[in-house]
Regions:
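Structured catalytic cores of large enzymes
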Residues: 1-57
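Catalytic cores of nucleophile-dependent amide-cleaving enzymes
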Residues: 1-20, 85, 90-178
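Loop/turn elements at helix/coil->beta-strand transitions in domains of secreted/extracellular proteins
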Residues: 29-35, 56-57, 77-81, 118-122, ...
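Active-site-proximal C-terminal subdomain of hydrolase catalytic domains
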Residues: 126-242
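Exposed beta-strand-loop-beta-strand "reactive/processing" segments of non-cytosolic proteins
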Residues: 282-319
């Protein structure tokens, strides 16, 4: 089943979402008229560019090179496929998405920015709490501001999201990158979400971070909507052939089959040195070591408090201390 939803909020009215249904009914954007834009934290530019090249054959804009005051001028207001790989936060006062370069975390995009978009658009965001809306006012949530203005489809996470800084990445990188690439290729937003979930589950046995990604990313908007293929079609007409994708239900308990463990000082030192080298902003932070009781793998979790949010690195490593995979919170 392809399911989308509309977020609710305190003191909402029918008119808040009336615009959405009018927009989706009369949208006439075809696949040849798609104009993409991407904005990413400088820290994640490598992985962001790999995915945005697949989506748009372009490079992303970066923050802190741009902040929320300059981003909208550089992104423009006429784009209709938007990609964001930024930080997000849960705090009610931290309403924006944030860039990063080393220890600099500027506000990169805000609810007021999204209201300036003039074209109808589809959006995907990798940020932690990128799709937050429960117990927030409209002006505190980019999701709410988007869905009550020009947004036709929005995919994001309600909780902490994870990805990588280099290579094709993982988790949120795969989810949002595959989703927007599929939308760009003419699939409905519901089908695109299904393809993204299928891509995430197809490689191997899922670990805790991948299971959480499947549970935390939600689609907002009519799942049957897609950019039309020619000017004689209507955007809300279902595809004639809908692929049958098998997406196995994740083992939710697998996300919590962890126990605190100990390794030798030598092994912990090897792991720490690797993390401190790749992520110098975490230098000196001591990790908590966990063991997955289902398969015996180890992970080291580093937490760093910033002014607006907590950053997390979860590094899976072998018995000899070699880093196998690294997940970075968004």
């Amino acid at each position: 089943m392809r399911v989308g939803r509309l977020p609710t909020f305190k003191n909402e009215s029918f008119n808040d979402f009336k615009t959405y249904f009018e927009n989706i009914k009369f949208c006439t954007i075809n696949t040849k008229q798609i104009i993409e834009a991407g904005l990413a934290a400088k820290q994640w530019v490598n992985t962001s560019n790999i995915w945005f090249d697949k989506i748009a054959n372009k490079k992303v804009l970066t923050s802190p090179q741009l902040d929320k005051f300059s981003a909208i001028q550089n992104i423009g207001t006429e784009k209709n496929l938007l990609y964001f790989n930024l930080h997000g936060a849960e705090d009610s006062d931290a309403c924006d998405w944030y860039g990063q370069e080393n220890e600099n975390y500027p506000s990169a995009f805000s609810p007021s920015n999204i209201l300036k978009q003039e074209s109808l658009y589809i959006l995907g965001v990798e940020a932690c709490y990128g799709a937050r809306y429960i117990n927030y006012k409209k002006e505190q949530s980019i999701l709410l501001s988007a869905m009550t203005s020009k947004c036709l489809g929005f995919l994001g996470s309600s909780k902490i999201a994870y990805g990588a800084c280099y290579g094709e990445g993982s988790c949120a990188n795969v989810m949002i990158g595959t989703y927007l690439k599929s939308v760009r290729n003419g699939l409905s937003i519901g089908e695109s979400f299904a393809v993204a979930r299928s891509e995430l589950t197809s490689k191997r046995k899922l670990n805790a971070k991948e299971i959480k990604t499947l549970l935390e990313f939600s689609l907002y908007g009519d799942p049957s909507f897609r950019f039309i293929e020619n000017s004689n079609q209507k955007s809300f007409v279902a595809q004639k052939s809908i692929s049958k994708l098998h997406i196995p239900m994740p083992d939710v308990l697998g996300a919590v089959n962890l126990e605190i463990a100990k390794v030798s000082e030598k092994i912990e030192s090897i792991v720490n040195n690797s993390i401190y080298s790749d992520y110098p902003e975490f230098n000196g932070i001591k990790p908590i070591i966990y063991k997955d009781t289902s398969d015996g793998t180890y992970s080291a979790v580093y937490k760093k408090d910033n002014e607006k949010f907590i950053q997390i690195i979860d590094a899976y490593f072998s018995e000899d201390g070699q880093i196998l995979r690294t997940y970075v919170s968004k």
